[in-house]
Regions:
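A residue-level marker of the well-folded mature domains of exported/periplasmic proteins
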Residues: 13, 20-333
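Intrinsically disordered, low-complexity terminal regions enriched in Ser/Thr/Gln/Glu/Pro/Gly/Ala
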Residues: 8, 17-18
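Positively charged n-region of N-terminal signal peptides that target proteins for export
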Residues: 1-9
Length: 333
């Protein structure tokens, strides 16, 4: 009998949706594309529009760096806006970029229900639409999506969790947990990937697996969830979080409680690298699943140019592989 225990805890803050991607396996051949929107143009003639989730997140800032690097290298004009993780604002940004004369537009579809109508409307006006980090399953007009293989990232996190237990002799009745965010598809995929691994060891290692709750992308909420979990499960051995903000909050709770619980996060933002390498925090925040947002930004821009110039994309879905960061490969610029 599974010991999956859901803690229903109140959340005091609600933020908008964060990054979300897919876990589909990309096709082996580039799909046929419609006629490009800017026939006869070269890369240097193009004006391309981009809508980030929020510059408050280091992840999106790195995506923007990749976009701007592609702009400098290829010569197109990049107009980069942000949606503050709000679908209604994302829709307004799309309309602004259409009016501004962009040859193609790409966005992180953090709220598909709210922003898909604007995506479809822009496509109907002849502006090719692309997506990065998070796409929409509610329309088929998106020419190309570039994002992280989030399910595989969850698998990496699950494997790291089990390895920690094995390396530290905690394979007989340990308690492990997860802080989730079951709204963005990316975080759902990460959670499912993690469970696919740890559930295989539940009976073998007599694990107690605890779902700490939904942190809603907010570090303060994550701290509260972790505080409550440590009261109920003071011997918690390890947790996995679906985003680094959850680790930031959980770290504070673990230190305050004097717990020996360790954490494995997801994103590998700069604060994760710093914590992993820190003499004290690194004893708790031991690893993180890394994405490559710079590459995501560069690749989506590259495919937008390709589509506008000759009507092709590398693939309709391009997934960037995640990897584990720990003390052996973490770095601080």
């Amino acid at each position: 009998m599974k010991k999956l225990i859901a803690l229903l805890l109140a959340c005091v803050m609600v933020l908008g949706l964060v990054a979300c991607g897919g876990n589909e396996t990309p096709a082996t051949e580039a799909p046929a594309a419609d006629a490009p929107a800017a026939e006869g143009k070269t890369a240097a003639d193009l004006k391309l529009g981009f809508v980030l989730g929020s510059r408050e997140h280091a992840f999106y800032c790195s995506i923007e760096e990749g976009i701007l690097a592609a702009s400098e290298e290829m010569g197109f004009e990049a107009v980069v806006l942000e949606s503050d993780l709000d679908g209604a604002i994302a829709s307004e940004r799309i309309e602004t970029l259409v009016v501004d004369g962009c040859d193609a537009i790409s966005l992180s579809v953090n709220d598909p229900t709210a922003s898909t109508p604007a995506i479809v409307a822009a496509d109907a006006e002849g502006v090719p639409m692309f997506a990065f980090d998070c796409t929409s399953s509610e329309t088929d007009v998106i020419k190309c999506f570039v994002g992280t293989d989030n399910y595989q990232g969850g698998v990496v996190g699950g494997e790291a969790t089990i390895k920690y237990l094995e390396d530290n002799g905690l394979t007989d009745g340990a308690t492990i947990g997860i802080i989730g965010y079951p709204e963005p598809q990316s975080c759902i995929d990460r959670e499912n990937g993690w469970f696919s691994v740890v559930n295989e060891y539940e009976e073998k290692y007599n694990l107690t697996i605890v779902n700490l709750g939904n942190y809603k992308g907010d570090a303060t909420t994550a701290e509260s969830l972790m505080n409550d979990a440590l009261i109920s499960y003071p011997d918690m051995a390890a947790i996995f979080t679906v985003g680094d903000p959850a680790c930031v909050g959980a770290l504070a709770a673990i230190k305050s409680a004097g717990s020996s619980c360790v954490m494995i996060g997801f994103d590998a933002n700069p604060e994760a690298h710093e914590a992993i390498l820190d003499a004290e925090n690194g004893k708790i925040w031991i690893a993180d699943v890394a994405q490559d947002p710079y590459q995501i930004g560069y690749l989506i821009a590259q495919n937008m140019v390709s589509y506008c110039v000759d009507g092709t994309v590398t693939d309709s879905t391009i997934l960037v592989s995640p990897y584990l960061v720990d003390a052996s490969n973490a770095s601080v610029d």
